[in-house]
Amino acid sequence: LIFSSGETFFSSADLIKRDFKEIDSHSISLPNAYLKQHNLTKEKLIRRLKKFSELKICIIGDLIIDEYITCHALGMSHEDPSIVVTPMDSQKFIGGAGIVASHAASLGASVDFISVTGEDEIRNYALETLSKNSVNAKLLVDESRPTTLKQRYRSKNKSLLRVSHLYQGAISIAHQNKMLELIKQGINDTNLLVFSDFNYGCLPQSLVNNIMNITKNHKLFVAADSQSS
Protein backbone atom coordinates (compact mmCIF):
# COMPACT_ATOMS: atom_id res chain seq x y z
CA LEU A 1 0.00 0.00 0.00
CA ILE A 2 1.61 3.22 -1.20
CA PHE A 3 0.53 6.73 -0.20
CA SER A 4 1.54 9.76 -2.23
CA SER A 5 0.59 13.41 -2.71
CA GLY A 6 -1.28 12.55 -5.91
CA GLU A 7 0.72 15.15 -7.83
CA THR A 8 2.74 12.79 -10.05
CA PHE A 9 2.11 13.26 -13.76
CA PHE A 10 3.10 11.12 -16.73
CA SER A 11 3.44 11.98 -20.39
CA SER A 12 2.70 8.55 -21.85
CA ALA A 13 1.39 5.09 -21.04
CA ASP A 14 4.92 3.70 -21.39
CA LEU A 15 6.18 6.01 -18.64
CA ILE A 16 3.29 5.02 -16.38
CA LYS A 17 4.04 1.32 -16.78
CA ARG A 18 7.76 1.86 -16.29
CA ASP A 19 7.33 3.95 -13.16
CA PHE A 20 5.07 1.43 -11.45
CA LYS A 21 7.39 -1.45 -12.36
CA GLU A 22 10.44 0.39 -11.05
CA ILE A 23 9.17 1.68 -7.70
CA ASP A 24 12.07 2.51 -5.43
CA SER A 25 11.27 0.75 -2.16
CA HIS A 26 13.89 2.87 -0.36
CA SER A 27 11.68 5.94 -0.82
CA ILE A 28 8.78 4.29 1.04
CA SER A 29 8.66 4.64 4.82
CA LEU A 30 6.22 3.80 7.59
CA PRO A 31 4.47 6.67 9.44
CA ASN A 32 5.78 5.41 12.78
CA ALA A 33 4.51 8.35 14.83
CA TYR A 34 0.96 7.85 13.53
CA LEU A 35 1.10 4.09 14.13
CA LYS A 36 2.32 4.60 17.69
CA GLN A 37 -0.30 7.27 18.45
CA HIS A 38 -3.13 4.96 17.37
CA ASN A 39 -1.58 1.76 18.73
CA LEU A 40 -1.44 0.19 15.27
CA THR A 41 0.79 -2.66 14.17
CA LYS A 42 1.14 -4.49 10.89
CA GLU A 43 -0.29 -7.63 12.49
CA LYS A 44 -3.39 -5.76 13.72
CA LEU A 45 -3.98 -4.21 10.30
CA ILE A 46 -3.68 -7.58 8.56
CA ARG A 47 -6.20 -9.13 10.97
CA ARG A 48 -8.62 -6.24 10.34
CA LEU A 49 -8.29 -6.52 6.58
CA LYS A 50 -8.89 -10.26 6.65
CA LYS A 51 -12.12 -9.69 8.59
CA PHE A 52 -13.47 -7.50 5.78
CA SER A 53 -14.53 -10.62 3.91
CA GLU A 54 -16.95 -11.36 6.77
CA LEU A 55 -18.73 -8.00 6.47
CA LYS A 56 -21.94 -7.02 4.71
CA ILE A 57 -21.87 -3.24 4.11
CA CYS A 58 -24.58 -0.91 2.83
CA ILE A 59 -23.31 2.37 1.35
CA ILE A 60 -25.74 5.13 0.46
CA GLY A 61 -24.82 8.44 -1.12
CA ASP A 62 -24.02 10.54 -4.16
CA LEU A 63 -22.57 8.72 -7.15
CA ILE A 64 -20.12 10.84 -9.17
CA ILE A 65 -18.42 9.97 -12.44
CA ASP A 66 -15.11 11.73 -13.10
CA GLU A 67 -13.98 12.17 -16.70
CA TYR A 68 -10.51 13.39 -17.66
CA ILE A 69 -10.22 14.67 -21.23
CA THR A 70 -6.66 15.09 -22.44
CA CYS A 71 -6.37 17.84 -25.04
CA HIS A 72 -3.82 19.26 -27.45
CA ALA A 73 -3.76 23.04 -27.18
CA LEU A 74 -3.88 24.73 -30.59
CA GLY A 75 -3.57 28.31 -29.35
CA MET A 76 -5.73 31.33 -28.69
CA SER A 77 -8.92 31.98 -30.63
CA HIS A 78 -8.93 34.95 -33.02
CA GLU A 79 -12.63 35.60 -32.33
CA ASP A 80 -12.58 35.83 -28.54
CA PRO A 81 -10.18 35.46 -25.58
CA SER A 82 -10.38 31.68 -25.29
CA ILE A 83 -8.07 28.69 -25.73
CA VAL A 84 -8.66 26.35 -28.67
CA VAL A 85 -7.99 22.65 -28.00
CA THR A 86 -8.42 19.30 -29.71
CA PRO A 87 -9.52 16.40 -27.46
CA MET A 88 -7.05 13.52 -27.79
CA ASP A 89 -8.12 11.03 -25.14
CA SER A 90 -10.81 10.52 -22.50
CA GLN A 91 -10.94 8.37 -19.38
CA LYS A 92 -13.84 7.89 -16.97
CA PHE A 93 -13.64 6.80 -13.34
CA ILE A 94 -16.13 5.95 -10.62
CA GLY A 95 -16.10 8.62 -7.91
CA GLY A 96 -18.07 9.94 -4.96
CA ALA A 97 -19.87 7.31 -2.92
CA GLY A 98 -19.29 4.86 -5.77
CA ILE A 99 -15.55 4.70 -5.14
CA VAL A 100 -16.19 4.18 -1.42
CA ALA A 101 -18.32 1.15 -2.33
CA SER A 102 -15.69 -0.10 -4.78
CA HIS A 103 -12.89 0.16 -2.20
CA ALA A 104 -14.95 -1.74 0.38
CA ALA A 105 -15.66 -4.49 -2.16
CA SER A 106 -11.98 -4.68 -3.16
CA LEU A 107 -11.15 -5.41 0.49
CA GLY A 108 -13.46 -8.42 0.36
CA ALA A 109 -16.70 -7.11 1.85
CA SER A 110 -20.12 -7.84 0.39
CA VAL A 111 -21.36 -4.39 -0.64
CA ASP A 112 -24.78 -2.95 -1.46
CA PHE A 113 -24.61 0.54 -2.95
CA ILE A 114 -27.74 2.70 -3.06
CA SER A 115 -27.83 5.93 -5.04
CA VAL A 116 -29.80 7.97 -7.58
CA THR A 117 -28.90 8.59 -11.23
CA GLY A 118 -30.41 10.01 -14.36
CA GLU A 119 -31.59 7.90 -17.29
CA ASP A 120 -28.49 8.29 -19.48
CA GLU A 121 -25.33 6.69 -20.83
CA ILE A 122 -23.33 7.71 -17.76
CA ARG A 123 -25.69 5.60 -15.64
CA ASN A 124 -24.99 2.62 -17.91
CA TYR A 125 -21.24 3.16 -17.53
CA ALA A 126 -21.65 3.30 -13.74
CA LEU A 127 -23.67 0.08 -13.59
CA GLU A 128 -21.17 -1.78 -15.75
CA THR A 129 -18.13 -0.53 -13.84
CA LEU A 130 -19.62 -1.12 -10.39
CA SER A 131 -20.55 -4.65 -11.42
CA LYS A 132 -16.93 -5.28 -12.49
CA ASN A 133 -15.89 -3.97 -9.07
CA SER A 134 -18.13 -6.60 -7.39
CA VAL A 135 -20.52 -3.97 -6.06
CA ASN A 136 -24.25 -4.74 -5.91
CA ALA A 137 -25.47 -1.38 -7.23
CA LYS A 138 -29.07 -0.38 -6.63
CA LEU A 139 -29.34 2.83 -8.63
CA LEU A 140 -32.74 4.49 -8.68
CA VAL A 141 -33.62 6.49 -11.80
CA ASP A 142 -34.62 10.13 -11.42
CA GLU A 143 -35.46 11.57 -14.83
CA SER A 144 -35.37 15.13 -13.47
CA ARG A 145 -31.58 15.03 -13.02
CA PRO A 146 -28.52 13.81 -14.90
CA THR A 147 -26.13 11.25 -13.50
CA THR A 148 -23.52 13.47 -11.86
CA LEU A 149 -20.57 13.84 -14.25
CA LYS A 150 -17.52 16.01 -13.65
CA GLN A 151 -15.39 16.64 -16.70
CA ARG A 152 -11.86 18.05 -16.57
CA TYR A 153 -10.21 19.24 -19.76
CA ARG A 154 -6.43 19.03 -19.41
CA SER A 155 -3.36 19.87 -21.45
CA LYS A 156 0.28 19.39 -20.47
CA ASN A 157 -0.70 18.31 -16.96
CA LYS A 158 -2.75 21.45 -16.33
CA SER A 159 -6.52 21.73 -15.94
CA LEU A 160 -7.93 24.15 -18.50
CA LEU A 161 -11.62 23.83 -17.76
CA ARG A 162 -13.99 21.94 -15.49
CA VAL A 163 -17.56 21.16 -16.50
CA SER A 164 -20.01 19.71 -13.96
CA HIS A 165 -23.23 18.04 -15.13
CA LEU A 166 -25.34 17.81 -11.97
CA TYR A 167 -28.45 18.81 -10.08
CA GLN A 168 -28.11 19.64 -6.40
CA GLY A 169 -31.78 19.61 -5.43
CA ALA A 170 -32.98 17.04 -2.91
CA ILE A 171 -34.44 13.82 -4.28
CA SER A 172 -38.22 13.49 -4.13
CA ILE A 173 -40.18 11.93 -1.26
CA ALA A 174 -41.02 9.04 -3.59
CA HIS A 175 -37.34 8.31 -4.18
CA GLN A 176 -36.60 8.66 -0.47
CA ASN A 177 -39.26 6.05 0.29
CA LYS A 178 -37.79 3.70 -2.33
CA MET A 179 -34.38 4.04 -0.70
CA LEU A 180 -35.85 3.27 2.71
CA GLU A 181 -37.45 0.12 1.32
CA LEU A 182 -34.13 -1.03 -0.17
CA ILE A 183 -32.43 -0.51 3.19
CA LYS A 184 -35.17 -2.38 5.06
CA GLN A 185 -34.90 -5.33 2.67
CA GLY A 186 -31.26 -6.01 3.53
CA ILE A 187 -30.83 -4.60 7.01
CA ASN A 188 -31.03 -7.91 8.87
CA ASP A 189 -27.87 -9.12 7.11
CA THR A 190 -26.01 -5.79 7.24
CA ASN A 191 -23.09 -5.17 9.63
CA LEU A 192 -22.35 -1.57 8.71
CA LEU A 193 -24.15 1.32 7.03
CA VAL A 194 -22.12 4.18 5.52
CA PHE A 195 -23.44 7.60 4.52
CA SER A 196 -21.27 9.11 1.79
CA ASP A 197 -22.66 12.60 1.23
CA PHE A 198 -21.28 15.02 -1.37
CA ASN A 199 -24.19 17.46 -1.01
CA TYR A 200 -25.81 16.65 -4.38
CA GLY A 201 -29.27 15.85 -3.05
CA CYS A 202 -29.10 12.11 -2.49
CA LEU A 203 -29.19 12.41 1.31
CA PRO A 204 -31.66 15.10 2.42
CA GLN A 205 -31.93 15.43 6.20
CA SER A 206 -35.41 13.88 6.31
CA LEU A 207 -34.08 10.71 4.66
CA VAL A 208 -31.07 10.56 6.98
CA ASN A 209 -33.37 10.88 10.02
CA ASN A 210 -35.59 8.04 8.81
CA ILE A 211 -32.60 5.81 8.08
CA MET A 212 -31.15 6.50 11.54
CA ASN A 213 -34.45 5.45 13.14
CA ILE A 214 -34.22 2.13 11.29
CA THR A 215 -30.58 1.53 12.23
CA LYS A 216 -31.25 2.30 15.92
CA ASN A 217 -33.95 -0.35 16.03
CA HIS A 218 -31.49 -2.89 14.61
CA LYS A 219 -28.50 -1.62 16.64
CA LEU A 220 -26.57 -1.20 13.40
CA PHE A 221 -23.21 0.57 13.38
CA VAL A 222 -23.31 3.72 11.21
CA ALA A 223 -20.43 5.73 9.74
CA ALA A 224 -20.68 9.02 7.84
CA ASP A 225 -18.48 10.95 5.44
CA SER A 226 -19.96 14.33 4.57
CA GLN A 227 -18.18 16.72 2.24
CA SER A 228 -18.54 19.04 -0.73
CA SER A 229 -16.60 18.61 -3.96
Model-predicted regions and their roles:
Residues L1-S5:
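Conserved C-terminal "lid"/linker of ANL adenylate-forming enzymes
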Residues F9-S11:
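N-terminal beta-alpha lobe that positions the nucleotide/phosphoryl donor
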Residues I16-L74, E79-D80, P87-S229:
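Ribokinase/PfkB-type carbohydrate-kinase core domain
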